Design a protein with these regions (language model features):
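Charge-rich, low-complexity N-terminal segments
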Residues: 1-84
Length: 84
């Protein structure tokens, strides 16, 4: 049940990236996850649906992409933000 904290971190990274790149509307976020990340996509999307309201990510979707090459401590990273 750590998806809430993970979602908050994704949103913090996304907000900072949006400001830095003058993006007003983020519409897609791609997260790469390793085989041992233990991220449940349904729970992550549940938290994201709640937390994104009223932000530059209000219309965004999150996609998880499995990456078997991620090993060790780092089992997840934000791969792509798309917006305008």
């Amino acid at each position: 049940m750590h998806e809430g904290a993970v979602c908050r971190e994704i949103m913090d990274i996304g907000s900072a990236a949006a400001v830095e790149n003058e993006i007003k509307n983020v519409y897609e976020i791609v997260i790469s996850v390793g085989p041992y990340s233990c991220i449940h996509e349904g729970q992550l999307n549940f938290y994201f649906d709640v937390l994104r309201k009223g932000t530059c990510m209000a219309d965004a979707v999150i996609h998880l992409e499995k990456d078997e090459s991620l090993t060790g401590v780092s089992q997840m990273y934000v791969k792509t933000f798309k917006g305008e």
